[in-house]
């Protein structure tokens, strides 16, 4: 996979798709205009893998089949403009909007954010949600996905010693704290193709 140039539109939060996560005309135009202007790679804003992972109102979604038509349409236009397309996916975790999540969850209990600790079963279900959304992105003709593991969202919460106090296979050592992320990446690799790009946004603090 090769981009036509090094100009990349970063995943910017626009809050332009308030219709239950369906891509709006405003967001469609905003993204495609950048490709019309010559950007070689277009990235979406962070899209939740479950409704419970929504971080703010107006967020573009990819967690439901009803979102697919909009993503097909977006990718058709971007590819006609010779731009690569990347879907950024995430779950807000303890930073989720309570109006959508109803029940905030994270790797460990967080009283400040009124979040409870995820069970092993919930962790497994969450990994499935990430993989299913990556597959949906692949089927909707995105050239790749980026896992958002920064800015204090769920994957980053698992990586962080501050937020991850677990004493099981998902906590403690860095290897254990990274297991959630690594498992997701490996499963996506198995269920897409070698040409499907898999990236990860990380930060060091």
PLM segments and residue spans:
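Conserved small/polar residues in nucleotide/adenosyl-binding loops
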Residues: 203-204
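Short amphipathic alpha-helices and their capping/turn segments at secondary-structure boundaries
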Residues: 1, 26-37, 72-80, 131-146, ...
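Aromatic- and acidic-residue-enriched carbohydrate-binding clefts of CAZyme catalytic domains
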Residues: 50, 62, 97-118, 157-175
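Metal-dependent enolase-superfamily TIM-barrel catalytic cores that perform enediolate-based chemistry
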Residues: 116-154, 166-187
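N-terminal capping/small domains of soluble enzymes
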Residues: 1-90, 126
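Alpha-helix-loop-beta-strand connector modules within alpha/beta enzyme cores
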Residues: 60-81, 165-196
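Non-globular sequence segments
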Residues: 76, 80, 84, 90-142
């Amino acid at each position: 996979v090769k981009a036509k140039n090094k100009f990349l539109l970063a995943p910017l939060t626009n809050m332009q798709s308030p219709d239950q996560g369906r891509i709006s005309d405003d967001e469609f135009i905003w993204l495609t205009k950048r490709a019309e202007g010559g950007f070689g790679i277009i990235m979406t804003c962070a899209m939740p893998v479950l409704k419970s992972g929504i971080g703010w109102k107006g967020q573009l979604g990819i967690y439901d089949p009803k979102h697919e038509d909009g993503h097909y349409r977006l990718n058709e236009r971007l590819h006609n403009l010779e731009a690569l397309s990347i879907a950024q996916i995430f779950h807000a975790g303890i930073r989720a909007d309570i109006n959508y999540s109803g029940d905030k969850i994270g790797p460990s209990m967080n009283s400040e954010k009124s979040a409870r600790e995820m069970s092993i079963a919930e962790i497994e279900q969450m990994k499935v949600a990430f993989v299913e959304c990556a597959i949906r992105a692949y089927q909707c003709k995105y050239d790749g996905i980026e896992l958002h593991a920064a800015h204090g969202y769920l994957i980053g919460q698992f990586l962080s010693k501050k937020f991850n106090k677990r004493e099981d296979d998902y906590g403690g050592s860095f290897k254990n704290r990274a297991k959630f992320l690594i498992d997701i990446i490996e499963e996506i690799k198995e269920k897409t193709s070698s040409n499907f790009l898999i990236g990860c946004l990380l930060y060091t603090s």
